[in-house]
Amino acid sequence: MLGELTKKEIEDVLMSNVVGRIGCSSQQKIYVVPVTYAYDGESIIGHTVEGMKIDFLRENPECCFQIDDIKNLFDWVSVIAWGTFEELKGEEAARCSDLLMKRISPIVSAGASQPHRMGPLPTARQATFEKNPIIYRIRIKEKSGRFERR
């Protein structure tokens, strides 16, 4: 059976996952990239370094965020949220960074710290991240969710 998720089910999917995908666009290109995240009940919180994703989001802050939980072809849920990207600074960045670290620390300590199967970050990238992390949020304006169950 195909169906739409309730508001509570959408919130549960957002709260219970730590890996999603940001979809953003710049001029004639669309870019979708997996990221680790935390959900604070209103916004998606993430961190990154300079690169294509940040370039696109700075140019066009309107974006979407997608999360799914797929058990098999006939048992899955998917949530899409649309919102506006914001870079965070100062105390707000520190607060959101703490929230993000608390949410993703279980996967890091469980040895699953590379959810994107990238392997360890190259030394130069890791050094850049530690020195100049970009903390951001996506302020959600709209959410939708679907499921299939048999």
Residue ranges of predicted features:
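Short, basic/aromatic recognition patches
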Residues: 1-21
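Short beta-strand segments
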Residues: 17-49, 65-66
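Solvent-exposed residues in well-ordered beta-strands and their adjoining turns
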Residues: 40, 49, 68, 86-88, ...
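Short acidic (Asp/Glu) patches
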Residues: 48-51, 60-68, 116-123
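Helix-adjacent hinge/juxtasegments
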Residues: 53-60, 64-86
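Charged, gly/pro-rich active-site loop segments
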Residues: 77-150
